[in-house]
Amino acid sequence: MEEVIKILEQIKPGVDFNTEENLIKEEILDSFDIVTLVAKLNDEFDIEITPADLVPENFNSAEKIYELVTRLEEE
Protein backbone atom coordinates (compact mmCIF):
# COMPACT_ATOMS: atom_id res chain seq x y z
CA MET A 1 0.00 0.00 0.00
CA GLU A 2 2.85 2.34 0.86
CA GLU A 3 4.34 1.99 -2.64
CA VAL A 4 0.97 2.85 -4.21
CA ILE A 5 0.73 5.99 -2.09
CA LYS A 6 4.30 7.01 -3.02
CA ILE A 7 3.44 6.70 -6.71
CA LEU A 8 0.24 8.71 -6.24
CA GLU A 9 2.17 11.43 -4.37
CA GLN A 10 4.65 11.67 -7.25
CA ILE A 11 1.78 12.21 -9.67
CA LYS A 12 -0.33 14.54 -7.50
CA PRO A 13 1.58 16.05 -4.56
CA GLY A 14 -0.38 17.63 -1.73
CA VAL A 15 -3.31 15.19 -1.67
CA ASP A 16 -3.94 13.06 1.43
CA PHE A 17 -4.20 9.70 -0.29
CA ASN A 18 -4.60 7.93 3.06
CA THR A 19 -8.07 9.43 3.55
CA GLU A 20 -9.31 10.57 0.12
CA GLU A 21 -11.96 8.19 -1.28
CA ASN A 22 -13.23 10.07 -4.34
CA LEU A 23 -10.16 10.61 -6.49
CA ILE A 24 -12.12 10.23 -9.72
CA LYS A 25 -15.50 11.59 -8.68
CA GLU A 26 -13.97 14.78 -7.28
CA GLU A 27 -11.61 15.02 -10.28
CA ILE A 28 -8.48 14.92 -8.15
CA LEU A 29 -7.01 12.55 -10.73
CA ASP A 30 -7.66 13.42 -14.37
CA SER A 31 -7.29 11.16 -17.40
CA PHE A 32 -3.61 12.08 -17.89
CA ASP A 33 -2.94 11.25 -14.23
CA ILE A 34 -4.62 7.85 -14.67
CA VAL A 35 -2.55 7.04 -17.76
CA THR A 36 0.62 7.98 -15.87
CA LEU A 37 -0.49 6.00 -12.82
CA VAL A 38 -1.28 2.89 -14.86
CA ALA A 39 2.14 3.00 -16.54
CA LYS A 40 3.93 3.39 -13.21
CA LEU A 41 1.89 0.64 -11.54
CA ASN A 42 2.50 -1.73 -14.46
CA ASP A 43 6.26 -1.12 -14.23
CA GLU A 44 6.60 -1.06 -10.43
CA PHE A 45 4.52 -4.17 -9.73
CA ASP A 46 5.09 -6.08 -13.00
CA ILE A 47 1.36 -6.28 -13.72
CA GLU A 48 -0.83 -5.45 -16.71
CA ILE A 49 -3.78 -3.17 -16.08
CA THR A 50 -6.11 -3.77 -19.02
CA PRO A 51 -8.84 -1.53 -20.45
CA ALA A 52 -11.39 -3.69 -18.59
CA ASP A 53 -9.73 -2.61 -15.32
CA LEU A 54 -10.00 1.10 -16.17
CA VAL A 55 -13.22 1.79 -14.30
CA PRO A 56 -13.63 4.58 -11.73
CA GLU A 57 -14.34 2.10 -8.94
CA ASN A 58 -10.77 0.78 -9.22
CA PHE A 59 -9.19 4.24 -8.93
CA ASN A 60 -11.32 6.21 -6.45
CA SER A 61 -8.93 5.68 -3.52
CA ALA A 62 -5.43 4.45 -2.76
CA GLU A 63 -7.02 1.44 -1.08
CA LYS A 64 -8.99 0.51 -4.23
CA ILE A 65 -5.88 0.95 -6.36
CA TYR A 66 -3.95 -1.28 -3.96
CA GLU A 67 -6.72 -3.91 -4.15
CA LEU A 68 -6.51 -3.82 -7.96
CA VAL A 69 -2.72 -4.23 -7.89
CA THR A 70 -2.96 -7.10 -5.40
CA ARG A 71 -5.60 -8.88 -7.48
CA LEU A 72 -3.54 -8.53 -10.66
CA GLU A 73 -0.37 -9.75 -8.93
CA GLU A 74 -2.22 -12.92 -7.92
CA GLU A 75 -3.44 -13.65 -11.46
Model segments located where?
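Phosphopantetheine carrier-protein modules
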Residues: 9-28, 47-55
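AMP-binding/adenylate-forming catalytic domain of the ANL superfamily
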Residues: 53-64
